């Protein structure tokens, strides 16, 4: 973690009482801003807070919502990987295998190294995905995080995040990028490399392994060469 950083949770002290989206204010538990290393090379962007994130304030955190792994009002397929793995086995497990998350750290306060986690939107409605207007309302938060962190690699997690990030940071039209084909590949963007990821809750074991292998290969390269190495 950056030597001058005091906290991993909402390190830029963004508005934790934001009311830009009235409908989401009625359904959220917590305003979920970014979490992690402000000197990170790798910035992960999801669509919206998970159920666990809404509870803890930490993006991508998730817990089993019940005996079948679901949360109220959502389809079982949204909370289990194919084959029955729960969503709590998702992104964190991948980061642990890459050496980017301390395996002994608490589920709701992961100790991340060189990683920052955030979302397109900061609040959750458990019954629906965010609207385009809600994503636009939250865009200044995301833009500020990307600008202040200045990562080397953006990892859009899921179809919606890929479309938004590709539109903003690449010259490739979003309609030309299908997540199934872009998963576990590197896309050169404007100032950033993109490595798209299917939501870990929806990945097959083969897709998870493919993404891990591709990202490990990327980490072994001089991926910082376009911006120069920064002191951490």
What kind of region is each of these model predictions?
Residues 2-232:
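A polyanion-binding, active-site-adjacent surface
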């Amino acid at each position: 973690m950056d030597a001058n950083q005091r906290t991993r949770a909402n390190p830029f002290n963004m508005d934790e009482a934001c009311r830009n989206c009235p409908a989401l204010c009625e359904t959220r538990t917590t305003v979920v801003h970014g979490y992690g290393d402000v000197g990170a090379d790798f910035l992960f962007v999801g669509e919206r807070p998970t159920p666990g994130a809404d509870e803890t304030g930490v993006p991508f955190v998730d817990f089993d919502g019940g005996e079948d792994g679901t949360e109220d009002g959502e389809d079982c397929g949204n909370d289990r990987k194919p084959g029955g793995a729960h969503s709590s086995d998702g992104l964190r497990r991948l980061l642990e295998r890459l050496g980017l998350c301390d395996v002994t750290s608490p589920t709701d306060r992961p100790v991340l190294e060189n990683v920052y986690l955030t979302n397109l939107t900061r609040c959750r409605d458990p019954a629906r995905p965010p609207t385009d207007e809600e994503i636009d309302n939250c865009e200044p938060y995301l833009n500020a995080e990307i600008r202040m962190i200045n990562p080397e690699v953006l990892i859009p997690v899921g179809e919606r995040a890929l479309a938004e990030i590709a539109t903003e940071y690449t010259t490739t039209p979003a309609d030309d990028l299908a997540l199934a084909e872009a998963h576990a590949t590197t896309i050169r963007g404007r100032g950033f490399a993109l490595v798209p990821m299917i939501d870990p809750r929806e990945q097959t074991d083969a897709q998870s392994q493919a993404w891990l292998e591709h990202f490990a290969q990327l980490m072994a390269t001089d991926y910082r060469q376009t911006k120069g190495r920064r002191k951490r």
